[in-house]
């Protein structure tokens, strides 16, 4: 009798283990993530980082908006890495697809953390990114509400600037990109239970793409002569 009870208990535990939902991982990086050869051979570096995100999003699990003021953590819907690092890597991928002006390529450092601290030496140009909002909405329709502030900074090489400014980054351009709206259509290749999450992840990724395009345009069109000299490497 005791053995039967033990066997039943073991069967219940096994069934409970089988019912645990699997973890699903998402990334902001575009599918064709490999940087083109021209970008990798470019002589000048745009360092991506630091990238900061709201404290509430500083976790691997998804935080989803519910109603006007609520939020819910989805334990089994996860980013492939910390959100700040994923934003940094996605920014690198989008920038190195071609929108950067000639002679520049983007890098988030060997670890891809977006901190900029792991680069071998200070880059002449740096992109600081502050994610102000990164709202994921699943119902009634998958959507996002994003707000990202970006700042291009230049490390002057002009010795005439004096000891106060020497070795300090100066702001070239700063702006805020707002992106909100319905997520793109469902991808039939994704299992049905995951389509809402996949749509939201792709919408967030599109926000990063728009920021990358804004940054590239600002680098191409800078009218500030000192900034222009820094960007062109003169």
Regions found by a protein language model. Name each.
Residues 3-9:
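Sec-dependent signal peptide recognition
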Residues 14-17:
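C-terminal motif of bacterial Sec signal peptides marking the signal peptidase cleavage site
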Residues 19-36, 98-160:
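Surface-exposed short loop/turn segments
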Residues 43-126, 214:
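N-terminal segment of the mature soluble domain
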Residues 45-50, 63-65, 126-131, 145-151, ...:
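Soluble periplasmic/extracytoplasmic beta-strand elements of cell-envelope proteins
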Residues 70-77, 157-215:
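Short secondary-structure boundary motifs at beta->alpha junctions and helix caps
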Residues 217-234:
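Short, highly charged C-terminal tails/helix-capping segments
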